[in-house]
Swiss-Prot record:
It comes from Aspergillus oryzae (strain ATCC 42149 / RIB 40). Disulfide bonds: none annotated. Belongs to the COQ4 family. Its EC number is 4.1.1.130. GO terms for biological process: ubiquinone biosynthetic process. Pfam families: Coq4. This is Ubiquinone biosynthesis protein coq4, mitochondrial. GO terms for cellular component: extrinsic component of mitochondrial inner membrane. It is found in: Mitochondrion inner membrane. It is an enzyme of class 4 (lyase). It is a peripheral membrane protein.
Length: 285
């Protein structure tokens, strides 16, 4: 009997020692990449809290060091938009008739859905013609926008995709170019209109501007962004595809957007002024 008791005690002791190991391995497995939840839509990459935080910090730092890295800007936008900000933007669409229509129909802005030859044939000063002229002048295409990956809610993922694809329309309506000075000015406007954190964080890239550019940003573009961003309607609710023939000046008035000074023209005038001063100094020497 004593032997049986000892054996029973030994087996119980072995069981008690092995049980915590099993629990620990199960807990560790729950954070394993192999145990990641299934994607909720094509291209979706589910992230846990730590992964999302690392993505937000890493992409933000990378985008600050190289503001032309559109992939890092996109990743930062997605990582910092949840849990609150993208839902606020989605709710803004749900509270607006046009926004609800966009969410139902889910249009995409590409060179196939908006052919450039058609846009170029539209009346002068129309929204579509202005958009096409801006694309031609800046040498960009609507097909370069990355697909959303890191937002878990499928409907909110579309909202972020919609914002991303409408970004060039914001450029066209305001006339702001794609070089860094223009992008920062537009991001400041977008932040006050959409409250997407990435657009606000993008303003830190102003530290990388040349002193004269940074001075212009705080003297001209930031005050304009504050005025127009706070006064304008929610741009996410604009169904751009249905107003292509509308006069762009009329649209700006309806949306409450003040047209900023022509950034390219200002830079051209400054270059010419510097050239004249240089020639004058050479002649006087």
């Amino acid at each position: 009997m004593s032997v049986l008791r000892r054996r029973g005690a030994l087996s119980l002791r072995e069981l008690s020692l092995s049980t915590p190991v099993t629990v620990v391995s199960c807990r560790a497995r729950s954070f394993s990449v192999n145990n990641r939840p299934p994607p909720k839509y094509p291209g979706h990459v589910p992230l846990n809290f730590v992964e999302r935080g690392a993505l937000a910090v890493g992409s933000a730092v990378g985008a600050l060091l190289n503001p032309r890295r559109a992939d890092l800007i996109a990743a930062c936008g997605e990582a910092t938009a949840t849990p609150y900000f993208i839902y606020r933007l989605r709710d803004a669409m749900l509270s607006d008739p046009t926004g609800r229509q966009i969410l139902r129909e889910r249009p995409r802005i590409t060179s196939e859905t908006l052919p450039l030859p058609y846009l170029r044939s539209l009346p002068e000063n129309s929204v579509g013609r202005t958009y096409a002229a801006w694309l031609d002048r800046e040498g960009v295409s609507p097909d370069t926008r990355d697909n959303v990956q890191y937002i878990d809610d499928e409907e909110c993922a579309y909202v972020m995709q919609r914002y991303r694809e409408c970004h060039d329309f914001y450029h066209a309506v305001t006339g702001l170019p794609t070089f860094v000075e223009g992008e920062i000015a537009l991001k400041a406007f977008e932040f006050l209109n959409t409250l997407i954190p990435m657009t606000g964080l993008s303003m830190f890239a102003a530290v990388r501007l040349k002193p004269a550019e940074r001075e212009r940003f705080f003297a001209l573009w930031l005050p304009w962004a504050v005025r127009s961003g706070l006064a304008s309607k929610e741009l996410i609710n604009v169904y751009w595809e249905k107003i292509l023939e509308k006069d762009v000046d009329e649209l700006r008035g309806e949306l409450g957007i003040e047209k900023p000074p022509d950034m390219r023209e200002i830079r051209r005038m400054i270059r010419e002024q510097k050239k004249r001063e240089k020639e004058r100094l050479q002649q006087s020497a």
